Regions:
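Non-catalytic accessory/interaction domains
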Residues: 2-242
Length: 242
């Protein structure tokens, strides 16, 4: 426990396959946004759960690195399976690219949230390209969890601030393609016995589609809802109004 108690920060675990695809190398250093040189020298005793396809194995990372045998060179690999670990994960581009919609949908909610949150923080830290983050979250079209969408929204809104005027319309188009199916699925109207999280998700999706996606149809729908309720006793759902 000393490694966790007597030094600052927490680990970043990087995951990379060798060229043959039969060995996974995990390396650790302290997570840092500013690439502090001291972070490279810090290590922890890190319990790690890894899922390779459907098989979960447990490992203890002691020191700088750990090599794990991989039988299937094309396997889908998830580090921090179950979301139990107190560390961030940075996948090599090849491993990140293997996480497609079907595989992502099968992950637990905390795993999906961590995947998005770790990826965006990797962008902020200069370890991942913004375009790679966008490509990753495009695989979340079937996502219906509010917390995961909040993590996606933080990243997409920040990406928009990085785009030039010529590049921004391309991002808006990709946001529309991602968000529209989810909003269509949950609908614009509050359902019977709907929980609060569903309403908050609707409000978030509408904002993403209408503002960040610059969707003209969604913008017009918002105007019609607002103006259509003026002078009436019916109340617009607060999350949709916001």
């Amino acid at each position: 426990m000393d490694s966790w108690i007597w030094q600052p920060g927490y680990p970043l675990i990087t995951a990379e396959l060798n060229s043959a695809g039969n060995a996974l190398t995990l390396r650790q250093q302290r997570f840092s946004f500013d690439h502090d040189s001291h972070a490279l020298t810090q290590t922890w005793l890190v319990p790690i759960h890894i899922r390779i396809n459907d098989q979960v194995s447990k490992h203890l990372l002691v020191g700088d690195s750990l090599e794990i045998e991989v039988a299937d060179s094309h396997a889908t690999i998830v580090v921090n399976a179950g979301g139990y670990g107190y560390y961030r994960v940075a996948y090599a581009s090849e491993l990140l690219g293997r996480l497609k919609g079907t595989e992502i949908a099968s992950l637990a909610t905390i795993e999906r949230y961590s995947l998005v949150d770790d990826a965006w923080n990797a962008v902020v830290a200069g370890r991942l390209q913004a375009i790679e983050f966008i490509s990753l979250v495009e695989e979340f079209s079937s996502e219906r969890d509010l917390a995961v969408w909040q993590a996606i929204a933080i990243g997409l809104r920040s990406c928009a601030r990085l785009m030039s005027n010529t590049e921004l319309p391309k991002l808006e188009n990709r946001i529309r393609s991602l968000v529209a199916p989810a909003l269509t699925d949950i609908g614009w109207e509050q359902g019977a016995n709907e929980d609060d999280l569903r309403g908050k998700l609707r409000g978030l999706l509408v904002t993403l589609l209408a503002i960040n996606g610059n969707d003209l149809t969604a913008q017009e729908r918002c105007r019609s809802i607002e103006f259509g309720h003026q002078g009436h006793d019916e109340i617009i759902h607060p999350d949709l109004l916001a």
